[in-house]
Amino acid sequence: MALRFPRFSQGLAQDPTTRRIWFGIATAHDFESHDDITEERLYQNIFASHFGQLAIIFLWTSGNLFHVAWQGNFEAWVQDPLHVRPIAHAIWDPHFGQPAVEAFTRGGALGPVNIAYSGVYQWWYTIGLRTNGDLYNGALFLLFISAISLIAGWLHLQPKWKPSVSWFKNAESRLNHHLSGLFGVSSLAWTGHLVHVAIPGSRGEYVRWNNFLDVLPHPQGLGPLFTGQWNLYAQNPDSSSHLFGNSQGAGTAILTLLGGFHPQTQSLWLTDIAHHHLAIAFIFLIAGHMYRTNFGIGHSIKNLLEAHIPPGGRLGRGHKGLYDTINNSIHFQLGLALASLGVITSLVAQHMYSLPAYAFIAQDFTTQAALYTHHQYIAGFIMTGAFAHGAIFFIRDYNPEQNEDNVLARMLDHKEAIISHLSWASLFLGFHTLGLYVHNDVMLAFGTPEKQILIEPIFAQWIQSAHGKTSYGFDVLLSSTNGPAFNAGRSIWLPGWLNAINENSNSLFLTIGPGDFLVHHAIALGLHTTTLILVKGALDARGSKLMPDKKDFGYSFPCDGPGRGGTCDISAWDAFYLAVFWMLNTIGWVTFYWHWKHITLWQGNVSQFNESSTYLMGWLRDYLWLNSSQLINGYNPFGMNSLSVWAWMFLFGHLVWATGFMFLISWRGYWQELIETLAWAHERTPLANLIRWRDKPVALSIVQARLVGLAHFSVGYIFTYAAFLIASTSGKFG
């Protein structure tokens, strides 16, 4: 008999039912569970797959460049970034009638096109690209890098080039190379690109390979570097009347500390950005020389950890045993990496709009909204993944003997206290926030809006004032003109920063009031509840009060009836599954808040947000209902318009989302009976019964159905909001 799918598990391959297919897909990437796996092969497979991942990323970015160069309007956009709409790619659709062709032919294109809301035009423009030829060159280069990555992945699967386990577990060498090589050298290289290509480009000078060695990035060349007069590189910066991409008002400085934004582009000064990357490079190049490898100098991480024993023995044996625990657990390492990456992705969402780095992106409102929402959702999925792999670590890799009385064991010892405190915080936030909102709703409904409970966020306003925002009247730190903090920065970055923070045309430290106070606490409720579910899932992964022996049941055991007191909703997977719903809800509140506040700011009617955001009906009526009118008008009796695709996606998103409930609120027996009936009918229907299948059809398991339901819920939720966000923003601001 030929080998059946899945080849990596002979046990599953023998399964006579359709379970074989679903379980095979589910465990395809769980290398640890495959037949004949060894620790060495596990590490080698993961390592090789990283190169495949890189190849896909480079191919994808190459495709972005290629399609914009081929079908976009980059050169026209460069001439007038504020009024030309950037084109992502052409649309070829045989179903388009004349009205659709007319609706989607825009941005100076000859046929139907998609508008780009990703910010790539602004990014490419800022870093010095100017022509379609530049874009094609970039696409070809990335295609080449993609091919190199694929070859490297294949190479590292060949016996001669397979690294050993000891190589993968050499933590110090890996840290040194990643810190110095990945962050240090790449930041230094990026500084070089900004100084040699992007900054001259912003001043109207076109630097390419043919004149790269002839154009001095700074009139004095490397002289100031070698004579120690580094301040010369900061002298004569671009003036406030500088036109980006033009020599008019341009200076000669390359590394500055101006603070604030370029008045025309509303983005950070390019010379400040170059300075920042140089500083990052310097720090990481040093950091990558700190750990002990073959040369016998520097820190040994194991020694560092074992020296960490708090005084008075208040944390037991401190960090003893942690080095081997972490170094021998891929799931622990992945959990740490995902947690870090999740936080950084959320920070990217925050900083892309509050401190925009790319020229003119701040004036492209739809792109700002899309990028913020995109990065917050990505961050949510990555962060929940961190806890999932933390739970798998406890089940598969945690050894109580190795970690006796250290900080990890003590976390498990007092998990009840951690979980109950989180529970209390979530309940407190939930009841109080909902109570305030509902009280305000009732007051509005009874026509007495003056009886609302409106709380000024004075602590947050004080923090904003400390950073230099003067409108609240707190005379503190940077908003006080006679303090030491103010005087220290007065000659360098402070004037630019204070100008930016007190100007109303950007998103830096937005003015906040009672509506912000309430939604902030609603978001805090979501964050704490999501964290509660995730933390409980990880800390109870090996055993809980109800079921102290979860280790041999694994990560995703299903509901198993009341025999052992019931195992429903107590596997680590169940906690992850529930947490994702909370994560999506929380990010829903975050993005609603961000978007509503910003559209009222951009439209100049910020009082609408301030007045309507203090009660739930305000959110439902003045944000969701009011802004979905464009969507509902994508198709109307007069034909269609360019929002019709978003109107369709809005409907389709709701459909996918609602389909999720068919899998979530259901009984397995019902589906099994339905399947048996369908199979019976099929076998007795002429013609149809010529088609046979080898596997007996069985209903999805409880865990599988939940996964399918969760996937539909998530995808539908995100599709629906993406369509709403893009249509309502682009419908208002063109």
Swiss-Prot record:
The keyword Secreted does not apply. Keywords: 4Fe-4S, Chlorophyll, Chloroplast, Chromophore, Electron transport, Iron, Iron-sulfur, Magnesium, Membrane, Metal-binding, Oxidoreductase, Photosynthesis, Photosystem I, Plastid, Thylakoid, Transmembrane, Transmembrane helix, Transport. SUPFAM superfamilies: Photosystem I subunits PsaA/PsaB. Chlorophyll a B1 binds at H654. Disulfide bonds: none annotated. Phylloquinone binds at W671. P700 is a chlorophyll a/chlorophyll a' dimer, A0 is one or more chlorophyll a, A1 is one or both phylloquinones and FX is a shared 4Fe-4S iron-sulfur center. Pfam families: PsaA_PsaB. It catalyses: reduced [plastocyanin] + hnu + oxidized [2Fe-2S]-[ferredoxin] = oxidized [plastocyanin] + reduced [2Fe-2S]-[ferredoxin]. Belongs to the PsaA/PsaB family. The PsaA/B heterodimer binds the P700 chlorophyll special pair and subsequent electron acceptors. PSI consists of a core antenna complex that captures photons, and an electron transfer chain that converts photonic excitation into a charge separation. The eukaryotic PSI reaction center is composed of at least 11 subunits. This is Photosystem I P700 chlorophyll a apoprotein A2. It comes from Morus indica (Mulberry). The lineage of its organism: Eukaryota, Viridiplantae, Streptophyta, Embryophyta, Tracheophyta.
